[in-house]
Regions:
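Phosphate-binding and adjacent anionic-ligand microenvironments
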Residues: 1-146, 152-176
Protein backbone atom coordinates (compact mmCIF):
# COMPACT_ATOMS: atom_id res chain seq x y z
CA UNK A 1 0.00 0.00 0.00
CA UNK A 2 2.72 2.47 0.94
CA UNK A 3 4.74 1.70 -2.21
CA UNK A 4 1.69 2.52 -4.33
CA UNK A 5 1.28 5.87 -2.55
CA UNK A 6 5.02 6.65 -2.77
CA UNK A 7 4.87 5.92 -6.50
CA UNK A 8 2.02 8.39 -7.00
CA UNK A 9 -0.79 5.85 -7.13
CA UNK A 10 -3.98 5.57 -5.14
CA UNK A 11 -4.51 2.16 -3.51
CA UNK A 12 -8.03 0.80 -3.33
CA UNK A 13 -9.13 -2.26 -1.38
CA UNK A 14 -11.65 -4.58 -3.02
CA UNK A 15 -12.90 -8.04 -2.20
CA UNK A 16 -10.58 -10.99 -2.66
CA UNK A 17 -11.14 -13.08 -5.78
CA UNK A 18 -10.41 -13.04 -9.50
CA UNK A 19 -13.90 -11.90 -10.47
CA UNK A 20 -13.70 -8.90 -8.12
CA UNK A 21 -10.24 -7.92 -9.42
CA UNK A 22 -11.39 -8.17 -13.04
CA UNK A 23 -14.51 -6.14 -12.31
CA UNK A 24 -12.43 -3.46 -10.59
CA UNK A 25 -10.18 -3.07 -13.63
CA UNK A 26 -13.15 -3.03 -16.00
CA UNK A 27 -15.03 -0.38 -14.00
CA UNK A 28 -12.06 1.88 -13.20
CA UNK A 29 -10.11 2.92 -16.27
CA UNK A 30 -7.61 4.84 -14.12
CA UNK A 31 -6.53 1.64 -12.33
CA UNK A 32 -3.44 0.32 -14.14
CA UNK A 33 -3.25 -2.93 -12.20
CA UNK A 34 -4.87 -5.06 -9.54
CA UNK A 35 -3.30 -7.63 -7.26
CA UNK A 36 -3.88 -9.96 -4.37
CA UNK A 37 -1.60 -10.97 -1.53
CA UNK A 38 -1.71 -14.49 -2.95
CA UNK A 39 0.45 -13.25 -5.83
CA UNK A 40 -2.20 -12.85 -8.53
CA UNK A 41 -1.70 -9.68 -10.57
CA UNK A 42 -3.75 -8.24 -13.40
CA UNK A 43 -2.36 -5.56 -15.74
CA UNK A 44 -4.98 -3.38 -17.35
CA UNK A 45 -3.43 -2.02 -20.54
CA UNK A 46 -3.39 -4.95 -22.97
CA UNK A 47 -5.45 -7.83 -21.63
CA UNK A 48 -7.43 -6.66 -18.59
CA UNK A 49 -8.32 -9.52 -16.31
CA UNK A 50 -5.62 -11.81 -17.69
CA UNK A 51 -3.70 -13.41 -14.82
CA UNK A 52 -0.60 -15.33 -15.89
CA UNK A 53 2.70 -15.34 -14.02
CA UNK A 54 4.74 -15.84 -17.20
CA UNK A 55 2.97 -12.96 -18.95
CA UNK A 56 3.39 -10.69 -15.93
CA UNK A 57 7.09 -11.58 -15.68
CA UNK A 58 7.58 -10.78 -19.36
CA UNK A 59 5.76 -7.46 -18.89
CA UNK A 60 7.90 -6.62 -15.85
CA UNK A 61 11.05 -7.29 -17.86
CA UNK A 62 9.67 -5.19 -20.71
CA UNK A 63 9.07 -2.26 -18.33
CA UNK A 64 12.51 -2.58 -16.78
CA UNK A 65 14.02 -2.75 -20.27
CA UNK A 66 12.80 0.79 -20.98
CA UNK A 67 15.23 2.17 -18.39
CA UNK A 68 18.97 2.55 -18.89
CA UNK A 69 21.04 -0.57 -18.23
CA UNK A 70 23.17 -0.62 -15.06
CA UNK A 71 26.34 0.03 -17.10
CA UNK A 72 24.61 3.16 -18.45
CA UNK A 73 23.66 4.52 -15.03
CA UNK A 74 20.42 2.63 -14.49
CA UNK A 75 19.72 0.67 -11.30
CA UNK A 76 20.53 -3.02 -11.00
CA UNK A 77 17.62 -5.45 -10.80
CA UNK A 78 18.50 -6.21 -7.17
CA UNK A 79 18.52 -2.48 -6.32
CA UNK A 80 15.01 -2.06 -7.68
CA UNK A 81 13.64 -4.79 -5.46
CA UNK A 82 15.67 -3.74 -2.43
CA UNK A 83 13.43 -0.64 -2.30
CA UNK A 84 10.37 -2.83 -1.73
CA UNK A 85 9.45 -3.28 1.93
CA UNK A 86 9.77 -6.79 3.28
CA UNK A 87 7.29 -7.00 6.13
CA UNK A 88 6.74 -10.22 8.05
CA UNK A 89 3.26 -11.70 7.81
CA UNK A 90 1.45 -14.80 8.86
CA UNK A 91 0.48 -17.48 6.42
CA UNK A 92 -3.13 -17.53 5.32
CA UNK A 93 -4.77 -19.19 8.32
CA UNK A 94 -8.03 -21.09 7.82
CA UNK A 95 -10.27 -21.55 10.84
CA UNK A 96 -13.45 -23.67 10.63
CA UNK A 97 -16.61 -21.65 11.14
CA UNK A 98 -18.45 -22.77 14.23
CA UNK A 99 -21.85 -21.17 14.24
CA UNK A 100 -23.30 -18.70 11.80
CA UNK A 101 -21.13 -16.71 9.46
CA UNK A 102 -22.87 -13.36 10.03
CA UNK A 103 -23.00 -13.78 13.81
CA UNK A 104 -19.33 -14.72 14.02
CA UNK A 105 -18.25 -11.78 11.85
CA UNK A 106 -20.43 -9.41 13.91
CA UNK A 107 -18.76 -10.68 17.09
CA UNK A 108 -15.30 -10.22 15.59
CA UNK A 109 -16.19 -6.71 14.40
CA UNK A 110 -17.50 -5.78 17.84
CA UNK A 111 -14.26 -7.01 19.45
CA UNK A 112 -12.41 -4.36 17.41
CA UNK A 113 -14.98 -1.57 17.90
CA UNK A 114 -12.28 0.79 19.19
CA UNK A 115 -9.99 0.26 16.18
CA UNK A 116 -9.87 1.77 12.69
CA UNK A 117 -11.08 -0.87 10.26
CA UNK A 118 -12.36 -1.59 6.78
CA UNK A 119 -15.23 -3.95 6.02
CA UNK A 120 -14.77 -4.11 2.24
CA UNK A 121 -13.71 -7.77 2.46
CA UNK A 122 -14.38 -9.12 5.92
CA UNK A 123 -12.79 -7.06 8.68
CA UNK A 124 -9.36 -5.52 8.16
CA UNK A 125 -8.11 -3.83 11.31
CA UNK A 126 -5.40 -1.16 11.06
CA UNK A 127 -2.67 -1.03 13.66
CA UNK A 128 -0.04 1.73 13.78
CA UNK A 129 2.53 -0.80 12.60
CA UNK A 130 0.53 -3.36 10.62
CA UNK A 131 -2.87 -4.94 10.11
CA UNK A 132 -5.07 -7.95 10.83
CA UNK A 133 -7.66 -9.43 8.46
CA UNK A 134 -10.53 -11.81 9.17
CA UNK A 135 -12.85 -12.67 6.31
CA UNK A 136 -15.24 -15.48 5.52
CA UNK A 137 -14.13 -17.68 2.64
CA UNK A 138 -15.98 -17.26 -0.64
CA UNK A 139 -15.94 -21.03 -1.22
CA UNK A 140 -15.73 -22.88 2.13
CA UNK A 141 -17.34 -22.69 5.60
CA UNK A 142 -14.17 -21.18 7.12
CA UNK A 143 -12.71 -17.88 8.23
CA UNK A 144 -9.50 -16.80 6.54
CA UNK A 145 -7.10 -14.78 8.68
CA UNK A 146 -3.80 -13.01 8.09
CA UNK A 147 -1.72 -10.42 9.88
CA UNK A 148 1.26 -8.29 8.91
CA UNK A 149 3.64 -6.12 10.90
CA UNK A 150 6.46 -3.73 10.07
CA UNK A 151 8.83 -6.07 11.86
CA UNK A 152 8.66 -9.36 13.75
CA UNK A 153 8.02 -7.65 17.10
CA UNK A 154 5.06 -5.68 15.76
CA UNK A 155 3.62 -8.80 14.11
CA UNK A 156 3.83 -10.68 17.41
CA UNK A 157 2.21 -7.74 19.21
CA UNK A 158 -0.66 -7.65 16.69
CA UNK A 159 -1.24 -11.41 17.01
CA UNK A 160 -1.25 -11.11 20.81
CA UNK A 161 -3.78 -8.26 20.65
CA UNK A 162 -6.01 -10.22 18.25
CA UNK A 163 -5.82 -13.25 20.53
CA UNK A 164 -6.75 -11.17 23.58
CA UNK A 165 -9.83 -9.82 21.78
CA UNK A 166 -11.21 -12.93 20.04
CA UNK A 167 -9.14 -15.89 21.23
CA UNK A 168 -11.95 -16.90 23.57
CA UNK A 169 -14.38 -17.38 20.64
CA UNK A 170 -12.03 -18.67 17.91
CA UNK A 171 -9.09 -21.06 17.97
CA UNK A 172 -6.24 -18.82 16.84
CA UNK A 173 -3.44 -21.28 17.58
CA UNK A 174 -2.56 -21.52 13.87
CA UNK A 175 -2.31 -17.73 13.43
CA UNK A 176 1.43 -17.23 13.78
Amino acid sequence: EEVIVESGGIPKMVRTGHSFMKKELRNNPDSPLAGEMSGHFFLRDRWPGFDCSLYNTARLLEMIGRDPAPDQGGPKFSERFARMPDYPSTDETKIPLIGGREETMATVEQAFADMEKSTVDGIRVRYPDGWYLCRPSNTEPILVMRAEGRNQESLISIIEDVNSRIGHILDLSELS
